[in-house]
């Protein structure tokens, strides 16, 4: 049998790295926002309520009210030069910079995807396989593990394999909340940005995205990993506990979420006479709606409205040299045995 004529022409011998973040709408218009929110809020990992209870609320109320409101919030922080969200911009940049870092190893192919929206995880896994990747490392861009973030990325990646006759081998990246390179990068970022201020914050809030308290009670390790990140960061900075305080943001719905809440804490501190604070978001790899609009925008406004005077938002690691050092370090570690 002539292999050149009887067998399909396929690439082989390459390793894929797929960076995956949460997702982004294609635009700020109502239609784009509704499409994005429908996919996001239909995920059973995100909303664990019974579908019989949740879907009437989702389709009857949420998708008729929130798209316009959330769209206006996105408009405030939209990357107008590229007509896209900053999360898309940063994730694409991270993939491009990582590809450059592996420039001397052409067998490594780096790509990026979103859990919700485009480009989809399934489309990029298929593209990597067509590019000759027999093995793919899926990297959920979340330092701390949560079922609503890391697990749903992994779910979607393995779901993509269900439709493939010839499946690539798949690995997933574990959480790296206590990795020394990550902690060092956060400490460097804090010191670097505080040095640019002509004032010193009385304290810094480490604001993590929240999850319902019930998820934690069911065994989700997220809360513990956030606390460990903060503890290690304090130790690296040489700060006491009250100098770097943990809070949780972005609460949605009527359930109790992890506390203390960031918004309530910011308001309380201002009312208690604290005049200068800074906020960092250690759990976000890239700046996005939750950091740029909710913290740099809403939280800053609340602090000033309630008597605070100086507020600083410390940017996420994004595609900075420190941020890329973390991502490249984690990927090289997880490729061991393959590369």
Swiss-Prot record:
One of its GO terms (cellular component) is cytoplasm. One of its GO terms (biological process) is heme biosynthetic process. It is found in: Cytoplasm. Its EC number is 4.98.1.1. Signal peptide: none annotated. InterPro entries: Ferrochelatase, Ferrochelatase_AS, Ferrochelatase_C, Ferrochelatase_N. Keywords: Cytoplasm, Heme biosynthesis, Iron, Lyase, Metal-binding, Porphyrin biosynthesis. It catalyses: heme b + 2 H(+) = protoporphyrin IX + Fe(2+). It is an enzyme of class 4 (lyase). It holds the Pfam family Ferrochelatase. GO terms for molecular function: ferrochelatase activity; metal ion binding. Catalyzes the ferrous insertion into protoporphyrin IX. Belongs to the ferrochelatase family. This is Ferrochelatase. The lineage of its organism: Bacteria, Pseudomonadati, Pseudomonadota, Alphaproteobacteria, Hyphomicrobiales.
């Amino acid at each position: 049998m002539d292999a050149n004529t009887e067998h399909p022409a396929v690439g082989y011998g390459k390793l894929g790295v797929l960076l995956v973040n949460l997702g982004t709408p294609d635009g700020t218009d109502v239609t784009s926002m509704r499409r994005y929110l429908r996919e996001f809020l239909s995920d059973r990992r995100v909303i664990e309520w019974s579908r019989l209870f949740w879907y009437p609320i989702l389709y009857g109320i949420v998708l008729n009210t929130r798209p316009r409101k959330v769209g206006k919030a996105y408009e405030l922080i939209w990357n107008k030069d590229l007509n896209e969200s900053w999360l898309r911009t940063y994730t694409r940049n991270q993939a491009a910079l990582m590809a450059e870092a592996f420039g001397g190893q052409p067998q490594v192919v780096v790509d990026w995807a979103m859990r919700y929206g485009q480009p989809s995880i399934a489309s990029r896994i298929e593209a990597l396989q067509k590019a000759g990747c027999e093995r793919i490392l899926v990297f959920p861009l979340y330092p701390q593990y949560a079922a609503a973030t890391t697990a749903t990325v992994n779910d979607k990646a393995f779901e993509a394999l269900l439709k493939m006759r010839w499946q690539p081998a798949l690995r997933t990246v574990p959480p790296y909340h206590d990795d020394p390179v990550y902690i060092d990068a956060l400490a460097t970022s804090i010191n670097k940005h505080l040095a640019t201020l002509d004032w010193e914050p009385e304290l810094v809030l480490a604001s993590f995205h929240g999850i319902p308290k019930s998820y934690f009670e069911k065994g989700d390790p997220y809360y513990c990993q956030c606390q460990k990140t903060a503890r290690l960061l304090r130790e690296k900075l040489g700060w006491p506990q009250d100098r770097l305080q943990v809070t949780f943001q972005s609460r949605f719905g009527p359930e109790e979420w992890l506390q203390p809440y960031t918004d309530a804490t910011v308001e309380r501190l201002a009312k208690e006479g604290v005049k200068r604070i800074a906020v960092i978001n250690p759990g976000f790899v890239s700046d996005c709606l939750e950091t740029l609009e909710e913290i740099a925008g809403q939280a800053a406004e609340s602090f000033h409205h309630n008597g605070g005077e100086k507020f600083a938002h410390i940017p996420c690691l994004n595609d900075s040299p420190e941020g890329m050092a973390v991502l490249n370090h984690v990927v090289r570690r997880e490729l061991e045995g393959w590369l």
